[in-house]
Amino acid sequence: MGIKVVATNKVAYHNYNIIETYEAGIVLKGSEVKSIREGSVNLRDSFVRIDNGEAFIYNMYIAPYKPASKLQHDPYRKRKLLLHKREILKLMGKVQEKGLTIIPTKVYLKNGKVKIEIALAKGKAKYEKREAIKERDMKRELSKKYKGKIKL
């Protein structure tokens, strides 16, 4: 079947420097899986926290599945992530030591299963964000100016 990307967290790449990424499974209800297959998921403002040796994702919005009338899920409930114990311990150590955070970057379907890509990230300062925007604008201007003449 392959991989089908359902949602990406574009804001994460603007606000954070991504250090490492991990693939995790996620515990979902049936209506949540159907909503994700439709693409009704939003990762903005979501984050991962490790509680009692288990990883949970908070503030991940999964829209209610419209055809399911009676049994609806809470769109913002906390959901358990499925990671190996050594991965959780490694993430816990890095988050406590260096002031890093764990954020979701992508939700995708892999061989029919819903997977989430989480990243160990460090927040960018305001000036770093401004520099990235300036650099992007300069590249865009150069590519417009020399369209087809040089490659960047």
Curated annotation (Swiss-Prot):
<dbReference type="InterPro" id="IPR023620">
    <property type="entry name" value="SmpB"/>
</dbReference>
<dbReference type="Pfam" id="PF01668">
    <property type="entry name" value="SmpB"/>
</dbReference>
<dbReference type="GO" id="GO:0005829">
    <property type="term" value="C:cytosol"/>
</dbReference>
<comment type="function">
    <text>Required for rescue of stalled ribosomes mediated by trans-translation. Binds to transfer-messenger RNA (tmRNA), required for stable association of tmRNA with ribosomes. tmRNA and SmpB together mimic tRNA shape, replacing the anticodon stem-loop with SmpB. tmRNA is encoded by the ssrA gene; the 2 termini fold to resemble tRNA(Ala) and it encodes a 'tag peptide', a short internal open reading frame. During trans-translation Ala-aminoacylated tmRNA acts like a tRNA, entering the A-site of stalled ribosomes, displacing the stalled mRNA.</text>
</comment>
<dbReference type="InterPro" id="IPR000037">
    <property type="entry name" value="SsrA-bd_prot"/>
</dbReference>
<dbReference type="InterPro" id="IPR020081">
    <property type="entry name" value="SsrA-bd_prot_CS"/>
</dbReference>
<keyword id="KW-0694">RNA-binding</keyword>
<protein>
    <recommendedName>
        <fullName>SsrA-binding protein</fullName>
    </recommendedName>
</protein>
<comment type="similarity">
    <text>Belongs to the SmpB family.</text>
</comment>
<dbReference type="GO" id="GO:0070929">
    <property type="term" value="P:trans-translation"/>
</dbReference>
<keyword id="KW-0963">Cytoplasm</keyword>
<dbReference type="GO" id="GO:0003723">
    <property type="term" value="F:RNA binding"/>
</dbReference>
